[in-house]
Amino acid sequence: MIVGRRLKHHSLALAIGPSLTTFGVADALADPRLGIFNGATLIAENDNWSIVPAETVATAQATRDTGAFGLANGSKDAALILTLAPGAYTAQVSGADGTITGVALIEVYEVP
């Protein structure tokens, strides 16, 4: 992700794994962990987007506001709402336990 504006940027980042099965993806990553890096520094991570109630409400609203992939309550998909300064960032998805493999989709949106 490149944030090129001079102001901070509000972003929604998603790592979709188990929800892909509804679209016929057979080898979907069952429990993704999403990490956002600035260089080699991990600045945020999430596993299971709907664990914290306040974050669940904000994330659900951000997905509606941006037209992002809808997440089912209780799913093991991962999501982060971030405020990023200008710069370059990397989104990385891995299995939550470090050994799980499969197909995942990463989406990143600007939140209005």
Each predicted region: which residue ranges?
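A sequence-level detector for low-complexity, Ser/Thr- and acidic-rich stretches
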Residues: M1-P112
